[in-house]
C-alpha cells in the first residue's frame, strides 16, 4: 500500500505542488526502519542460541531495509518538489532534529547488509557517519551563535543529532573493526548526553508538551540503552560496571515513561510512538550480552521478551493506521 501511495504521489505531483498540503511522510517516520533495523541486529546476536534467530533477523532486516529505501526515495522526492518544506524543517527549532534519523538509519541498514555484502555495508556506514557528523556540526553549532535558539529546542528529539547519531556511529565502526575510532564517537555521544540531559529534563519540568508531541517522549528511553549497546560493541560484549550503570539508569527512565504513558497517549495512539523503538531494540540487544555473560540472566530474558512484544505492538498499530488510511499526512 505504501508503494502504491508513493507511485500516486509521482503521478499527481503537479496537483500536489499546487496545493498547500503537507508532504505525506514526516521525517520522524524514519523511526520505523530505525526500530526494525535495531531489532534485527539484536536477533542476529542470538544466532548461537536459537537456530531460527538468524531467520528472524534476516526477515526483520529485509523489511527494515525495504522501508528505508522507500522512505529515502520519498525524501529525495521531497527535496526535489517540496524544498521549501525541507528548508522550513531544517530551521525549525524542534523538527530539525529528526533529520538526523536519515544518517542514523543509513548506518543501521549498513550494519544489516554487512552479513551479505561487507563492501556496500562499509560504504553506507561511512556515508552515515560523515553525514551525521556534518549535519550536527552545521545545525547544532548554529545554536551557539545566539538569537536562533529557543527553549522548545530542548525537547526529546534533541537527543538525535549529537547523542543517538554518535552512539550509532560508534557501534557501526566497531562492526567494521575501527574500535579506537568508535570510542571517539562513543565519547562524543556520552558527553553530549550528560550535558543535554539536565537541560532537557528541566524544560519538561517547567513546560508541558502539546499532545501531538508527547509520543516523542519515547526518545528519552534511547540514550542509556543505545549507549550500552554501543559500548558493548566496542568492548567485545563484556558486561562491566559501566554497562550495568547505563542499564540501571535506562530502567529508571523506563519506569518514569511507563508511569507517564497514559498521559502520552491521551489523544490516542499514533506513529510517533516509534520514538520508543530504538531504546526498546537496544534494550533487547544489550540484554543478549547480559545473558551471554551470565549476568542477571532472568532479567535479561524478561527484558528481551518485553522489548519484542512492545515493538510488535508498534508494528500492529502501524498496520492498523495503514489499513485505515491514517498513516500518511493529509
Q: Which residues does each predicted region cover?
A:
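N-terminal amphipathic/basic-hydrophobic helices that include classical n-h-c signal peptides
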Residues: 1-16
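Helix-coil boundary and interhelical linker segments in multi-pass alpha-helical membrane proteins
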Residues: 43-57, 111-123, 169-183, 231-242, ...
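Membrane helical hairpin/interfacial module
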Residues: 52-120
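Structural signature of hydrophobic alpha-helical transmembrane segments
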Residues: 59-70, 119-133, 180-193, 240-251, ...
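A generic, well-ordered mixed alpha/beta core segment in the N-terminal half of proteins
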Residues: 107, 111-143
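Alpha-helical transmembrane segments in multipass membrane proteins, preferentially the mid-helix core
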Residues: 138, 171-172, 195-204, 226-235, ...
Amino acid at each position: 500500500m505504501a508503494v502504491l501511495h508513493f507511485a500516486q504521489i509521482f503521478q499527481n505531483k503537479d496537483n500536489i505542488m499546487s496545493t498547500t498540503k503537507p508532504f505525506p511522510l514526516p521525517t520522524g517516520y524514519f523511526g520505523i526502519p530505525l526500530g526494525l533495523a535495531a531489532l534485527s541486529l539484536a536477533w542476529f546476536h542470538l544466532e548461537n542460541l536459537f537456530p531460527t534467530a538468524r531467520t528472524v533477523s534476516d526477515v526483520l532486516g529485509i523489511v527494515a531495509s525495504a522501508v528505508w529505501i522507500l522512505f529515502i526515495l520519498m525524501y529525495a522526492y521531497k527535496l526535489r518538489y517540496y524544498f521549501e518544506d525541507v528548508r522550513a524543517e531544517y530551521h525549525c527549532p524542534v523538527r530539525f532534529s529528526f533529520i538526523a534519523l536519515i544518517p542514523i538509519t543509513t548506518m543501521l541498514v549498513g550494519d544489516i547488509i554487512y552479513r551479505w555484502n561487507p563492501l556496500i555495508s562499509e560504504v553506507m556506514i561511512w556515508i552515515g557517519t560523515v553525514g551525521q557528523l556534518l549535519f550536527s556540526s552545521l545545525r547544532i553549532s548554529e545554536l551557539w551563535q545566539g538569537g536562533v535558539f529557543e527553549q522548545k529546542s530542548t525537547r526529546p528529539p534533541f537527543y538525535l543529532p549529537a547523542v543517538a547519531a554518535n552512539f550509532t556511529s560508534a557501534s557501526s565502526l566497531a562492526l567494521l573493526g575501527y574500535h579506537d575510532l568508535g570510542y571517539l564517537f562513543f565519547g562524543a555521544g556520552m558527553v553530549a548526553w550528560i550535558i543535554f540531559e539536565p537541560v532537557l529534563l528541566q524544560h519538561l519540568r517547567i513546560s508541558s508538551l502539546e499532545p501531538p508531541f508527547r509520543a516523542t517522549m519515547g526518545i528519552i528511553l534511547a540514550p542509556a540503552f543505545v549507549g550500552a549497546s554501543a559500548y558493548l560493541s566496542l568492548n567485545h560484549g563484556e558486561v562491566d560496571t559501566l554497562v550495568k550503570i547505563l542499564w540501571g539508569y535506562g530502567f529508571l527512565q523506563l519506569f518514569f515513561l511507563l508511569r507517564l504513558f497514559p498521559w502520552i497517549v491521551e489523544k490516542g495512539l499514533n506513529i510517533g510512538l516509534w520514538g520508543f523503538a530504538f531504546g526498546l531494540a537496544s534494550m533487547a540487544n544489550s540484554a543478549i550480552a547480559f545473558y551471554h555473560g551470565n549476568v542477571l540472566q532472568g532479567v535479561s530474558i524478561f527484558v528481551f521478551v518485553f522489548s519484542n512484544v512492545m515493538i510488535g505492538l508498534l508494528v500492529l498499530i502501524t498496520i492498523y493506521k495503514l489499513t485505515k488510511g491514517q498513516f500518511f499526512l493529509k
